């Protein structure tokens, strides 16, 4: 049984030997001539070389010791030792033979195993030479910096002002390591935080599950967020949330978005118009059967993907922008607006301080013949003799003629289809409407008074006054050439000679000028031409009482004429 197993193993080992080597082993040795010992030695060496792999494979087998006996192992060991000794002697004898040549890569056709066959390597240096650094140093920690002060600065900047550590150090470096100046700059800096709501985070996760890192498609599903904001949010949260577990799409294959896009292209559509969801003008509108309206393609894709309408704008979703803040300088007007929008209480005349109060008994009026009458119920007020019949909390009413029913009724009245003239129902009146009504009434009264005053003006006398003024103007224009021809008022040089005396005509003209211009001495002196400003002033001071009496008399005459 052992011999059978051994022969099988030998046969299996021979399979690893090439056909040429197997033929050389099985072939019988040819008879060699006695006078050629070198060829005989070479043939024996070749035979032993081809048989050596079989013996080495036997020695490496771990299971061969269990199947072979002790005698076979001893026999094989002796044969191996004899063959190795013969090969060593042959190698030593042929080392001095220069006629024998082999390839340089395999001189003796042996496997070089052992310390004597190892390559000789030069000893390496204990430490490599330092290569020049090609990086440019931007910042280095100063040796003289106080570490305790630095720790306090970072704690203050990151804890109180919510600045990142790298931002705080950047500010400190910009201020040349001056902690006080850096702290002042840190107080002025404000970090703009891009806060995401829970709904937006959930929507981003869903889109990332469908689209992967196709941020443009995610942006189409989240129009209220910019593309840079979406990318920044992804890189800020990729270390916290494991997005790799969400990806269910291959980049080179079609995804759900592409399939939806193909489906949308086959939906019912209409020509260009305005989207009923986002109110944006689009060249193509598609019918959304679920919402029963026409929407643009982005809104349709968003609805088919998320099953909710696409947000129209950032203002509609962001809570921070839903509430419009009123500027400080507008709060006064807002408070006044709220006050004026309160129901009217009938005290506008007292608030404005104009006009006269009058009693009104038409707060609520009902016309029986009016077809538009829709009373809400009887208006019953229980009151005593001392009580005010008008309730302060009752809203006053005003007429409204712009409703469709009122316009139709007025049209019927014009066509004489309605025989009665009804009173159109009134709407609630506010304080603002009440004050506007009082102001309009006061303006109408003032305009009426002005018209009546104008009608009482004596137009004929005013025309005569205009003629007198034109005559005085012409006289003044002709006054200078007339003075040149007289001997008292002119000289040879052509200049006007100032007369220091007052003639009766000059006194009369001066008093008339005082009637018109009162104490404008410069203008009066310019009109009279022969008197200086000092002379006019002196004349006024000497005759002030007489001049004032003449002015009062002149005004009284004007009032009496206007009163007629």
UniProtKB/Swiss-Prot annotation:
Biased composition annotated in UniProt, kind: Acidic residues: 31-45, 68-86
Region (Disordered): 1-106
Domain (SANT) ranges: 191-242, 497-548
GO cellular component, one term: transcription regulator complex
Renumbered zinc finger spans (GATA-type): 275-299
Gene3D superfamilies referenced in this protein's UniProt entry, alphabetically: 1.20.58.1880, Homeodomain-like (1.10.10.60)
Domain ELM2: 109-190
GO terms (BP aspect): negative regulation of DNA-templated transcription; regulation of transcription by RNA polymerase II
Principal location class: nucleus
Keywords recorded for this protein, A-Z: Metal-binding, Nucleus, Repeat, Repressor, Transcription, Transcription regulation, Zinc, Zinc-finger
Subcellular location: Nucleus
InterPro entries linked: ELM2_dom (IPR000949), Homeodomain-like_sf (IPR009057), SANT/Myb (IPR001005), SANT_dom (IPR017884), Trans_reg/Corepressor (IPR051066), Znf_GATA (IPR000679)
A GO MF label: transcription corepressor activity
UniProt cross-references to Pfam families, sorted A to Z: ELM2, Myb_DNA-binding
UniProt-listed CDD domains: SANT
Family named by the database record: Belongs to the CoREST family.
Complexes and interactors: May be a component of a CoREST-like complex. May interact with chromobox protein homolog hpl-1.
Function as written in the Swiss-Prot or TrEMBL entry: Probable corepressor protein acting as a component of a complex that represses transcription. May play a role, as part of a CoREST-like complex, together with the chromobox protein homologs hpl-1 and hpl-2, in the formation of the vulva and in fertility.
Classification via PANTHER family: REST COREPRESSOR (PTHR16089:SF28), REST COREPRESSOR COREST PROTEIN-RELATED (PTHR16089)
Protein name per Swiss-Prot or TrEMBL: REST corepressor rcor-1
